[in-house]
Amino acid sequence: MKKRRSDMIKKGFDRAPHRSLLRAAGVKDEDFDKPFIAVVNSYIDIIPGHVHLQEFGRIVKEAIREAGGVPFEMNTIGVDDGIAMGHIGMRYSLPSREIIADSIETVISAHWFDGMVCIPNCDKITPGMMMAAMRLNIPTIFVSGGPMKAGVTKDGRKISLSSVFEGVGAYLGGTLDEKGLEELERYGCPTCGSCSGMFTANSMNCLAEALGLALPGNGTILAVDPARKELVRQSAKQLMYLIEHDIKPRDIVTEKAIDNAFALDMALGGSTNTVLHTLAIANEAGIDYSLERINEVASRVPHLAKLAPASDVHYIEDLHEAGGVSAVLNELSKKEGALHLDTLTVTGKTLGENIAGCEVKNYDVIRPIDNPYSETGGLTILFGNLAPDGAVIKTGAVQGGITRHEGPAIVFDSQEEALEGIASGKIKPGHVVVIRYEGPKGGPGMPEMLAPTSQIVGMGLGTKVALVTDGRFSGASRGLSVGHVSPEAAEGGPIAFIQDGDIIEIDTVKRTINVKLSDEELERRKANWKGFEPKVKTGYLARYSKHVTSASTGGIMRI
């Protein structure tokens, strides 16, 4: 009989008390020789991306039993970034990733499971589960809840949640009336699933395919498509193959696999949050992956698809109908050096074998390799005296083909102050809006800036104003928006010393971000800096603020 991890809690005379408890949980005599499987779900009623996952958990458990395993379901917490947006709730979003990873580690380690089926979907749940998978390194497969259908207005326009956020800006700017805003609200989110554009959740669930942690189709099959349930069933059965062949996450997620994930990210113009999360996943896998390496990937990978928010026409459902992630990767494989095709995946085959023959079905959605939107990827890491340790911009979602912006800073010490400034008309064409003390430590929690970016775009300033922050952006953000500025203001980074009127230059071609001040002037201002006073002094956020690291290292916790 093959020895299993779970034998720790079920084999031997001294485990009689353990078996007694397991029998009370429904385990039968014949089950004690079978692998124990953790069904790591994230069902929660208030998140539309997760409201349907209870049924997916049932499907997984049924499939595990059919394949000869014994399933046990657990749930993680979750935060809906859209609902948490614009108030203190957003400060809990990124920190929830660490709780998710820690809670999974706790349950799996305490109960000695043989493998995991992870069922995430929305923004921090997927990376939190991936971090746990790397940390635990037991056979694991991912199958997400799937994307939401795009909304459709009465006049036939496709819309998404980002359309609703931008509608608030248009309403503030007087270009949309209350009735128009209500229509966006009612039609923006028509089904369950992760929001319908290439936002953070869908970006990460697509990257799961490129990393090799999920079966093909994971990132794009709609939540309401019957094919999603079949994918859930097949994923559960595939885990049993991984257990039988002892294929573990760290066998799959290598440095080359992370290159592949970022290559897909560049081709799709994914969310800037993927940088933060993938660096954290790499850290858990014991891989030292630098921001500079991301630029190296971007330099050899073209941008092939523009989906919402970079496009008002194409959504995740369109990507799926055009061939999905496999078609994008297959198209990329036609360019030498764009992908490592020999990386292992949960299919037991290589990435190259998985994508062979997956041709693009619609070149309006996925451009051919010889006619990309740009020769370099849709994400760029910037460096300069304003961000010595790096900053991130989603170049694929910058409107009007703008590659350079120079203008005077208008500085806000919080997102709330910035929103007041935007609403009161303080932001003028040419400005560089600086929002600081919103990094991992300073926020605390590095809140997303979807409300400011959406209002700027909605007011018609999307091509006339830049935004720079040590916070981060929603995957639904677009425009000339630079986030993750490191070191952050709370750590005494240069962004803390910017004053109104300082001239900031952003150049995405040169990959630079600089403030036109001498080193001596920056040092003088630093000497007069009063330091950072934590905003939250009790509870989890206070502990998080004390121990979290920079965005440039993935916002992970110091041990």
Swiss-Prot record:
GO terms for molecular function: 2 iron, 2 sulfur cluster binding; dihydroxy-acid dehydratase activity; magnesium ion binding. Mg(2+) binds at residues 81, 123-124, 448. Pathway: Amino-acid biosynthesis; L-isoleucine biosynthesis; L-isoleucine from 2-oxobutanoate: step 3/4; Amino-acid biosynthesis; L-valine biosynthesis; L-valine from pyruvate: step 3/4. Homodimer. InterPro entries: Dihydro-acid_dehy_C, DihydroxyA_deHydtase, DiOHA_6PGluconate_deHydtase_CS, ILV_EDD_C, ILV_EDD_N, IlvD/EDD_N. Keywords: 2Fe-2S, Amino-acid biosynthesis, Branched-chain amino acid biosynthesis, Iron, Iron-sulfur, Lyase, Magnesium, Metal-binding. The gene is ilvD. One of its GO terms (cellular component) is cytosol. It catalyses: (2R)-2,3-dihydroxy-3-methylbutanoate = 3-methyl-2-oxobutanoate + H2O; (2R,3R)-2,3-dihydroxy-3-methylpentanoate = (S)-3-methyl-2-oxopentanoate + H2O. [2Fe-2S] cluster binds at residues 122, 195. It holds the Pfam family ILVD_EDD_N. One of its GO terms (biological process) is L-valine biosynthetic process. Functions in the biosynthesis of branched-chain amino acids. Catalyzes the dehydration of (2R,3R)-2,3-dihydroxy-3-methylpentanoate (2,3-dihydroxy-3-methylvalerate) into 2-oxo-3-methylpentanoate (2-oxo-3-methylvalerate) and of (2R)-2,3-dihydroxy-3-methylbutanoate (2,3-dihydroxyisovalerate) into 2-oxo-3-methylbutanoate (2-oxoisovalerate), the penultimate precursor to L-isoleucine and L-valine, respectively. Transmembrane segments: none annotated. SUPFAM superfamilies: IlvD/EDD N-terminal domain-like, LeuD/IlvD-like. The modification N6-carboxylysine is found at residue 124. This is Dihydroxy-acid dehydratase.
